[in-house]
Curated annotation (Swiss-Prot):
Coiled-coil parts of chain: none
Domain Helicase C-terminal positions: 235-396
GO biological process: cytoplasmic translational initiation
Name of a matching Pfam family: DEAD
Protein name per UniProt: ATP-dependent RNA helicase eIF4A
Taxonomy of the source species: Eukaryota, Fungi, Dikarya, Ascomycota, Pezizomycotina
InterPro entries: DEAD/DEAH_box_helicase_dom, EIF4A_DEADc, Helicase_ATP-bd, Helicase_C-like, P-loop_NTPase, RNA-helicase_DEAD-box_CS, RNA_helicase_DEAD_Q_motif
Description of how the protein assembles with itself and partners: Component of the eIF4F complex, which composition varies with external and internal environmental conditions. It is composed of at least eIF4A, eIF4E and eIF4G.
Record EC number: 3.6.4.13
Chain residue ranges for the region called Disordered: 1-20
Reaction it catalyzes: ATP + H2O = ADP + phosphate + H(+)
Gene Ontology, cellular component aspect: cytoplasmic stress granule
Source organism: Phaeosphaeria nodorum (strain SN15 / ATCC MYA-4574 / FGSC 10173) (Glume blotch fungus)
Gene that this polypeptide is encoded by: TIF1
Length: 396
């Protein structure tokens, strides 16, 4: 059961022992209603970790994936989980643990959204909520349960969360969970699961305590390392424009259009409604733009992406859902009309401006309310976002 390949791990980094990739969702043999959910969610093609990790999980291997936040790892295990569960069996078949309530709820939303066309229930089992409500929800036998270690452990001990149909156990952000002192509860949960349960572990770092979990509880795991440098801010000039009020962003954008010759740009907004609103406003001012968000069906989105890739449409306005699917070489400029609601998405939005070794420019519209988020982003990525200079046109 112990895995020999992990004894001498350099500086908390695992070595990949699996290099097969599947570069389209269509090639993964997913259930039709799951594939429909994947596309409806806004994915176009799998990210690096999705190309590598979804298939070994579906095939039933224990999998260790070392990947940073924001690489698409939540969807990696959500898609694999949904593929493996039997929707006719009303019992928990997959248990997903996360270090915080917020992350658990976020994962639940992703599972529910991607599983939208499947008859599958997913319950979030987290502290700070009513134990009675939890017990009631678990008695209905949701096929997927996602939760924090304390509450999940409690529910298994009360025999409300039954483990006899459990096929899969996912630990997300394992390093975080162990550093928060959940080690004992996690070990206890392992002991209460059927011996045959498949284990999938995701972690940004591989400290000793995480390696111990992998050697104790995983059988001959597939190891996948998605290096940090697959997403980088290097070569991307990042600026901000201070905008006094939200209402002034539109004029700021129009002014920018006047100063800068845009070969191709993506403008990100935080909501679908804002995308539609901005598209209407810019069209009314005679700017040619296309828009794309998760409310559109796949066929519509394909047409828009094709136009954008071919260059017949030069400006694309989109939501975060699509940040991961836009892979366009010519994008020289990314504008965050809204700063992303979570900092992990920042690199997904602007990292693409500099892909394929191209240089790019990112411009963030920042109101007084956004300053804190901008500082957080700077800290998180150890980067600097400077005030936009007058000669910005020369940089693009």
């Amino acid at each position: 059961m112990a895995d020999k390949g992990l004894e001498d791990v350099p500086e908390g980094q695992i070595e990949s022992n699996y290099d097969e990739t599947t570069d389209s969702f269509d090639a993964m043999n997913l259930k039709a209603e799951l594939l429909r959910g994947v596309y409806a969610y806004g994915f176009e093609r799998p990210s690096a970790i999705q190309q590598r990790a979804i298939m070994p999980v579906i095939k039933g291997h224990d999998v260790i994936a070392q990947a940073q936040s924001g690489t698409g790892k939540t969807a990696t295990f959500s898609i694999s989980t949904l593929q493996k569960i039997d929707s006719n069996v009303k019992a928990c078949q997959a248990l997903i643990l996360a270090p915080t309530r917020e992350l658990a709820q976020q994962i639940q939303k992703v599972v529910v959204a991607i599983g939208d066309f499947m008859d599958v229930a997913c319950h979030a089992c987290i502290g700070g909520t009513s134990v009675r409500d939890d017990m009631k929800a678990l008695q209905d036998g949701p096929q997927v349960v996602v939760g924090t270690p304390g509450r999940v452990h409690d529910m298994i001990q009360r025999r409300v969360l039954k483990t006899d149909h459990m096929k899969m156990f996912v630990l997300d952000e394992a390093d975080e969970m162990l550093s928060r002192g959940f080690t004992e509860q996690i070990y206890d949960i392992f002991q209460l699961l059927p011996q045959s349960t498949q284990v999938v572990l995701l972690s940004a770092t591989m400290p000793q305590d995480v390696l111990e979990v992998t050697t104790k509880f995983m059988r001959d795991p597939v190891r996948i390392l998605v290096k940090k440098d697959e997403l980088t801010l290097e070569g991307i000039k990042q600026f901000y424009i201070a905008v006094e009020k939200e209402d002034w962003k539109l004029d700021t954008l129009s002014d920018l259009y006047e100063t800068v010759t845009i070969t191709q740009a993506v403008i990100f907004c935080n909501t679908r409604r804002k995308v539609d609103w901005l598209t209407d406003k810019l069209t009314a001012r005679d700017f040619t733009v296309s828009a794309m968000h998760g409310d559109m069906d796949q066929a519509q989105r394909d047409v828009i992406m094709k136009e954008f890739r071919s260059g017949s449409s030069r400006v694309l306005i989109a939501t975060d859902l699509l940040a991961r699917g836009i892979d366009v070489q010519q994008v020289s400029l990314v504008i965050n009309y809204d700063l992303p609601a979570n900092r992990e998405n920042y690199i997904h939005r602007i990292g693409r401006g500099g892909r394929f070794g191209r240089k790019g420019v990112a411009i963030n519209f920042v109101t007084a309310d956004d300053v804190r988020m901008m500082r957080e982003i700077e800290q998180f990525y150890s980067t600097q976002i400077e005030e936009m200079p007058m000669n910005v046109a020369d940089l693009i």
